[in-house]
Amino acid sequence: MNLIKMSDIDLSGKRVLIREDLNVPIKDGMITSDQRLQAALPTIKSALDSGAAVIVLSHLGRPEEGKYEKKFSLEPVADYLRENLEYPVRFVKDYLTGVDVNPGELVVCENVRFNPGEKGNDEALAKKLASLCDVFVMDAFGTAHRAQASTYGVAQYAPVAVAGPLLIRELEALNQVLKAPKKPIVAIVGGAKVSSKLSLLKQLVGMVDVLIPGGGIANTFLKAQGFEIGISLYEPDLLDEARHILILAKEKGCQIPLPTDVVVGKTFSETCPAFNKSLSNVAADDMILDIGPETIRDYVDLIHEANTIIWNGPVGVFEFPQFAYGTRAIAIAIAESDAFSIAGGGDTLAAVDLYDLNQQISYISTGGGAFLECLEGKTLPAVAILQERAKHVKTN
């Protein structure tokens, strides 16, 4: 990768602006999952240890741009960093006209999405952000697919723009999957909609040996094959696309196993009774909410044969315990495998967290959309600008 790394630059005494992905779930002012914060801490600590004056930017949630909303404030994140770093930490709401920060001090800036022009990569905003620093560090893989003021624009105008350690690790892990994967390769792609992962599915059939669809995606494939799926979630306008993917997979030598048995309910509810049924017995008023025990065994066997595993999305409604067996079994099979495994996407990370398997997956990506776009073979805008800037950076 033609990138200048943060570790290549002497940061001592310099103002270092780090774009992190600190977009964590917060309920009643409390952080409910700190995965992304734990992933970002080493980069922030490394810059502070180097004697830099550090400023951190991030978004949180999806506020109306330009409007302050307390529930989307990064203040709880600043509190978390204060508790987990042995350095002074300040939280600053107004920072576009300048930030006073000393070497060995961290300033956490308020949600970048409160700034008008953030999503549209406004040039004036990008220049204001760039003026805050001597060195800009892009470390937020999770937002690298977005050309926004705090990810792309600032990298254009900062005196120096480099890649952070977390971003480098993410790209290297994906590179291992995309450039020189050990076969056989098994991909598990779950979630509600084929439409959101259509490009990914088409890309994967030409790349992997086995593609296991889950959730609403699997339902669309089943319906396309003529199976009764009752009132299950599926996309009627994508049945032809699903058939095309099945044909394409056959041409490419990619196996797409579909469920032979499922777990159904009558309503989408945590209290809804669950029933195991063979696919041929699904009734017109059934809702498929998980894979059945026979399918679980088949999928686990396929995972155990893999040397490379890609996981994006649950295979059932794992938020409801009675429909979580499939996702749990898949997660444990991946964790127990000796294969190189990479997992990404919000629901996937939530499942990994729920089953306490963080240490048993080879690499857990902090990205959702960026993870998918990398797997689709797309160039991430925020990485592209770093590569362009790298041509002109002098390391010292």
Swiss-Prot record:
Its EC number is 2.7.2.3. One of its GO terms (molecular function) is phosphoglycerate kinase activity. Keywords: ATP-binding, Cytoplasm, Glycolysis, Kinase, Nucleotide-binding, Transferase. The keyword Chaperone does not apply. Its main location: cytoplasm. GO terms for biological process: gluconeogenesis; glycolytic process. It catalyses: (2R)-3-phosphoglycerate + ATP = (2R)-3-phospho-glyceroyl phosphate + ADP. Transmembrane segments: none annotated. Substrate binds at residues 21-23, 36, 59-62, 113, 146. Pfam families: PGK. It is found in: Cytoplasm. GO terms for cellular component: cytosol. It is an enzyme of class 2 (transferase). Pathway: Carbohydrate degradation; glycolysis; pyruvate from D-glyceraldehyde 3-phosphate: step 2/5. ATP binds at residues 197, 319, 345-348. HAMAP family: Phosphoglyc_kinase. Belongs to the phosphoglycerate kinase family. Monomer. This is Phosphoglycerate kinase. It comes from Legionella pneumophila (strain Corby).
